[in-house]
């Protein structure tokens, strides 16, 4: 499981972006990204690789207090999508796995041990990583704007 991650503007991240033929802007880099936060993700649209911003939570609901705002659906913890459930037709990530895969760049990530207090931060030395991910497009009915949400594909817990 990935509980938090970092995306810092470094030579390694710049090299990764150049290798993928994309441009990552400094405002898309963040030192401590938590579930529900804004993340950069790489996806294809019309045969072109793009970097877009997404909420790190795959399933969003309309906020009843605001007609224009989508927020994480906390009923379903969907910031991560377990790899062993992607083939299950009843799984919430089943359709995005078949239709909208993406890459999520990172410089470091944090793993929890399940007790919510003990964490391990894995910092990549002179390297960068991309997580495999899933994304969804949501239409803001008032503005016509496309809003993205995404999750990281993870292994089942040990």
Residue ranges and their predicted role:
Residues 1-158:
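Short linear sequence motif anchored by a di-proline
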């Amino acid at each position: 499981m990935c509980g938090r991650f970092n995306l810092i503007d470094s030579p390694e991240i710049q090299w990764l972006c150049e290798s993928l033929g994309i441009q990552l802007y400094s405002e898309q880099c963040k030192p401590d990204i938590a579930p529900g936060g804004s993340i950069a993700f790489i996806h294809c649209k019309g045969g072109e690789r793009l970097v877009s911003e997404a909420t790190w939570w795959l399933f969003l609901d309309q906020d009843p207090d605001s007609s224009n705002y989508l927020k994480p659906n906390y009923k379903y913890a969907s910031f991560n999508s377990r790899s062993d459930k992607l083939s299950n037709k009843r799984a919430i990530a089943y359709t995005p796995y078949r239709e909208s895969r993406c890459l999520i760049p990172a410089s470091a990530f944090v793993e929890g041990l399940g007790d919510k207090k003990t964490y391990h931060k894995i910092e990549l030395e002179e390297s960068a990583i991309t997580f495999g991910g899933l994304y969804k497009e949501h239409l803001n009915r008032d503005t016509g704007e496309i809003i993205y949400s995404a999750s990281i594909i993870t292994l089942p817990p040990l």
